[in-house]
Amino acid sequence: MSNPFAHLAEPLDPVQPGKKFFNLNKLEDSRYGRLPFSIRVLLEAAIRNCDEFLVKKQDIENILHWNVTQHKNIEVPFKPARVILQDFTGVPAVVDFAAMRDAVKKLGGDPEKINPVCPADLVIDHSIQVDFNRRADSLQKNQDLEFERNRERFEFLKWGSQAFHNMRIIPPGSGIIHQVNLEYLARVVFDQDGYYYPDSLVGTDSHTTMIDGLGILGWGVGGIEAEAVMLGQPISMVLPQVIGYRLMGKPHPLVTSTDIVLTITKHLRQVGVVGKFVEFFGPGVAQLSIADRATIANMCPEYGATAAFFPVDEVSITYLVQTGRDEEKLKYIKKYLQAVGMFRDFNDPSQDPDFTQVVELDLKTVVPCCSGPKRPQDKVAVSDMKKDFESCLGAKQGFKGFQVAPEHHNDHKTFIYDNTEFTLAHGSVVIAAITSCTNTSNPSVMLGAGLLAKKAVDAGLNVMPYIKTSLSPGSGVVTYYLQESGVMPYLSQLGFDVVGYGCMTCIGNSGPLPEPVVEAITQGDLVAVGVLSGNRNFEGRVHPNTRANYLASPPLVIAYAIAGTIRIDFEKEPLGVNAKGQQVFLKDIWPTRDEIQAVERQYVIPGMFKEVYQKIETVNESWNALATPSDKLFFWNSKSTYIKSPPFFENLTLDLQPPKSIVDAYVLLNLGDSVTTDHISPAGNIARNSPAARYLTNRGLTPREFNSYGSRRGNDAVMARGTFANIRLLNRFLNKQAPQTIHLPSGEILDVFDAAERYQQAGLPLIVLAGKEYGAGSSRDWAAKGPFLLGIKAVLAESYERIHRSNLVGMGVIPLEYLPGENADALGLTGQERYTIIIPENLKPQMKVQVKLDTGKTFQAVMRFDTDVELTYFLNGGILNYMIRKMAK
């Protein structure tokens, strides 16, 4: 079918008649000029891809009519221009692609039809761990270990980059996916197949939203959805409401972009923006650099929105020049965006579009702050940190409480480290990490940290040797300007040597703490602290031994490392004493904004970006040396413990089976609120007494070789055993934190996997009960694949985080939702009952279904298949089955 909007296409420049764009102004529809800029991107993609099958004329009308349709839960398709993947989520995607080729061949189709149809960039950044720190060779040693542990995965990925068209792999040691995307991969405007169109993307990482700071619409999706986009399917999404976030004023000179984003995160969590876009506007936006905007956009998942969009303006174009982008491309980017009404002047209120709701922040009201101890939205002003931590100590166990009895608040434990005696207490800092693309992409906070380090060293201050300090920049550019500006030696002197280019501590790859420190924490039952410049601090994520974790700007990470404790009031208490015996306060070493900007102007230059990124695909010698086969079908090695052909397609036939009711299911787990994808499918270390450890031990591996769950996502046997294996999982059956459950028929307490296996052997279906925000956190496809492999047919929850719900759908697991005002407690459910879920043949999106218990009780729940497309996926047993059937025909 030809595109019914073909008449809108015209050359952007008469000199180049072969290069066209869809001129949305030719719609002559007054509604277009009132649309939020983010919605204009959705509209352009729909018009350009309209084929009356995947994208229909009615979809375009629905988007144009956004003012009304935003309130009606209407689904629209979106075909992003490209996909980005990181290696933890990318390995299972390439495994699925390889297995799909096998399945298509088995069903008589052409396996080479399975290929990405849009550009897919995979950045290897999740594998490196902080094994070595505080030594000059930390970087080399950590990279060597990364290769030793991950050689097999890396060989597989290198095979994928050669076997599949349109797939580029950025080797390990290059940087963090979102920073590499911002500084290098981002196009802003595509020039492809004779058309100009806005750059847009989805990524298999929830912080993909960082790119929204540059005016490129993008967000995180599950690996399963990303694979569908790579195969040419549009994403099906509810047309979102758009919250206009007006920024006014100018930030105080001592305030960092981190303080601004933590303030916005708390504010938007209170406003309630889950499932909505946030679009920034107002004169305050013009005060923010692209790095500042990217920091704010990066933490979008923490405030719960789908996207956090800053339309392109002059500052964006300046950033493209600063980062050494191609001058030829810069010529058409601005011209195209102006031609389609997508170029913004934040000082011109006449350009402000309509929004669902407007909220605002005066930047001058922002104060220096941190967030914690267990959630990114729990902002605490730095001036209140001591008081707040001390109130958390005694408060009831929860997001702001550790339930330490008052008589134990001043407990401490001495220990020997490096032949010297030290003391740990509640609030002692044991991890201080400058980490994560959230902040290392921002030269002002990184140079701020460097200048603070210089002043601290000059004042004779230091960091206790037992504190695990690290610096893991998101790209080589950071190290370049830290060295050129002369601050790197001072960072090293305080223990902040570069330990690797990757996510590291931010995703829990913080590596081991010194044994004496762990013993002191455990024996003293102390609430030890991690301070990091990351974006998430959920319990158990950063390190198992840091029960409190605070997000802070890079300069504050160093300040708390020097203090050695979170229990300090920087205004009244000194950081230490200098050689002359004088007290040194934080205000004495804090650099001014003018100092930072002067250094930034001098040392952050386009040549740096060009030099680093020119050689990005060839700079890693170990990667270059990897030998891989050139076959188009992958040869699965049965001895491999990293890469295994998944069982998802084993019994797949071309014919569809009608949907079946779930009869007499047992409850595997009875969970509460805010169960994250980290709880469901942890990414961190594999505990020695876990089912996954037993499996790997039986395959001849020693604990040293276990690596992490995240690195083993290409092996379903490990990942199924790692499902619900988080030591912080709180199962209401047990009333304690443990990766265990009660096997109801026998009453035995078992590891979750062992219980599920027993149910499966008896042919008994399973469900999970949960509370609000089920599946919050990372866009982890194994949090849906794992439960599927455990035999879980449905989850019954009060509400779902967006990405996780769509991942469950993509695996054919039913996301059921209680009716408003109902939950397990209100309905008197204990989880000991058996559940029958009646599934009718004539399914419709968001249909209410009957749930019957063996106690005789019945109630209704909503099946959260939100669109016809999602229903189609479910009826096929998941999105990949649907694609295989389509390709095999």
From Swiss-Prot:
Reaction catalysed by this enzyme: citrate = D-threo-isocitrate
Binding site for [4Fe-4S] cluster: C437, C503, C506
Gene Ontology terms, MF aspect: 3 iron, 4 sulfur cluster binding; 4 iron, 4 sulfur cluster binding; aconitate hydratase activity; iron-responsive element binding; iron-sulfur cluster binding; metal ion binding; mRNA regulatory element binding translation repressor activity; RNA binding
Binding site for substrate: Q86, D205, S206, H207, R536, R541, R699, S779, R780
Cofactor: [4Fe-4S] cluster
Sequence similarity: Belongs to the aconitase/IPM isomerase family.
Modified residues (Phosphothreonine): T628
Keywords per UniProt: 4Fe-4S, Cytoplasm, Iron, Iron-sulfur, Lyase, Metal-binding, Phosphoprotein, RNA-binding, Tricarboxylic acid cycle
GO BP term, pick one: intracellular iron ion homeostasis
Cofactor binding remark: Binds 1 [4Fe-4S] cluster per subunit.
One annotated Gene Ontology cellular component of this protein: Golgi apparatus
Organism: Homo sapiens
InterPro entries named in the record: AcnA_IRP_Swivel, Acnase/IPM_dHydase_lsu_aba_1/3, Acoase/IPM_deHydtase_lsu_aba, Aconitase/3IPM_dehydase_swvl, Aconitase/IRP2, Aconitase_4Fe-4S_BS, Aconitase_4Fe-4S_dom, AconitaseA/IPMdHydase_ssu_swvl
Protein name (database record): Cytoplasmic aconitate hydratase
UniProt effect for mutating R541Q: Strongly reduced RNA binding
UniProt keyword Hydrolase, yes or no: no
Entry superkingdom: Eukaryota
Entry-linked SUPFAM superfamilies: Aconitase iron-sulfur domain (SSF53732), LeuD/IlvD-like (SSF52016)
Primary site of residence: cytoplasm
